[in-house]
A protein has these predicted regions:
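A structural signal for leucine-rich repeat
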Residues: 190-194
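Structural signature of tandem-repeat unit edges
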Residues: 1-3, 13-26, 36-49, 59-72, ...
């Protein structure tokens, strides 16, 4: 077996754990969509792509490690995984898809690697437990509503590499205390930020 097909285990509500064999290179769209009891999944180093909505709605999934072999994560891949507390994003990934982690209300920390150049629309929308995020120097664009509704987010660092921030990227971040940014980048992006929260880098 080299792939897990689209919708393969959709709605298998009693499935608690899954170990994907080393022969698999791709996980299809909606492959484990709404496997409500799924608590753990082991993704082998052979996997290079995770499809759209692959684990969407897996509300019992608590942690996931995405191996370095993965180069693409589909839109909504982990959307509404409301028990997901941590995720390891590999250095091989270049973009975080639209709504990839939307509604992951238990997600507390996320490390975005230096390989990522874009953060998609609604990527972390409604991650209400997320407290801090550091955006690496590789990122050039942050999508619309990317961190909207992250009500526990206290600080964010925006590097000079960012050339565009979408509408409402940080709207509803009611706990936000500081946006760490250079003067130059702020002048370019100030229309999309909170002036009262700005802390300038040297």
């Amino acid at each position: 077996m080299t792939s897990i097909g689209n919708n393969a285990f959709w709605g298998c509500s009693s499935l608690q754990s899954v170990t994907i064999p080393d022969s698999v290179t791709s996980i299809g769209d909606d492959a484990f969509h709404e496997c409500l009891s799924l608590q753990s999944v082991t993704i082998p180093d052979s996997v290079t792509s995770i499809g759209d909505s692959a684990f969407s709605g897996c509300s019992s999934l608590q942690s996931v490690t995405i191996p370095d072999s993965v180069t693409s994560i589909g839109d909504r891949a982990f959307k509404d995984c409301s028990s997901l507390q941590s995720v390891a994003i590999p250095d091989s990934l270049t973009s975080i898809g639209d709504r990839a982690f939307q509604g992951c209300s238990s997600l507390q920390t996320v490390a975005i690697p230096d390989s990522v150049t874009s953060i998609g629309d609604d990527a972390f929308y409604g991650c209400s437990s997320l407290q801090s995020v550091t955006i690496p120097d590789s990122v050039t664009s942050i999508g619309d509503s990317a961190f909207m509704g992250c009500s526990s987010l206290q600080s964010v660092t925006i590097p000079d590499s960012v050339t565009s921030i979408g509408n409402k990227s940080f709207a509803g971040c009611k706990s936000l205390q500081s946006v760490i940014i250079s003067h130059q980048t702020y002048d370019r992006l100030k229309a999309k930020l909170y002036p009262s929260k700005i802390k300038f880098t040297e």
